[in-house]
């Protein structure tokens, strides 16, 4: 039984529509090279809540909360060819999307 080579692409952004859009673009590009694709798999959303005082001097009980959510997607490419890897290197992603590639 041959060992299958995998590439895992993890996309992360604060805007879920941006992550979904670029996940679809990556999948469309990889499908042109006839590689097997698994995904996009939605990973759990991480949320951070920041609590700050509304007033700089008094009223400790008056506070405001802000929340930041980071959305993640996972794409697996099974048995990629050299053409697939070249295509992934040439993709230009927007500045709002963080990409992590592992083999």
From Swiss-Prot:
PROSITE patterns the UniProt entry points to: RIBOSOMAL_S10
InterPro entries in the cross-refs: Ribosomal_uS10, Ribosomal_uS10_CS, Ribosomal_uS10_dom, Ribosomal_uS10_dom_sf
SMART domains: Ribosomal_S10
GO biological process: translation
Gene Ontology CC terms: ribonucleoprotein complex; ribosome
Signal sequence annotation: none
Disulphide bond pairs: none
One Pfam match: Ribosomal_S10
Molecular function, one GO term: tRNA binding
Nucleus in keyword set: no
Keyword annotations: Ribonucleoprotein, Ribosomal protein
Family: Belongs to the universal ribosomal protein uS10 family.
PANTHER family: 30S RIBOSOMAL PROTEIN S10 FAMILY MEMBER
Oligomer status and interactors: Part of the 30S ribosomal subunit.
Record function comment: Involved in the binding of tRNA to the ribosomes.
Protein name (database record): Small ribosomal subunit protein uS10
Gene: rpsJ
């Amino acid at each position: 039984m041959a060992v299958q080579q995998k590439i895992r692409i993890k996309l992360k952004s604060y805007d879920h529509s941006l992550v979904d859009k670029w996940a679809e673009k990556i999948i469309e590009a990889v499908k042109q090279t006839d590689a097997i694709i698994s995904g996009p798999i939605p990973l759990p959303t991480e949320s951070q809540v920041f609590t700050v005082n509304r007033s700089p001097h008094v009223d400790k009980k008056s506070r405001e909360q802000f929340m930041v959510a980071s959305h993640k997607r996972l794409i697996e490419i099974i048995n990629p060819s050299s053409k697939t890897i070249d295509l992934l290197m040439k993709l230009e992603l927007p500045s709002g999307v963080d990409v992590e590639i592992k083999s």
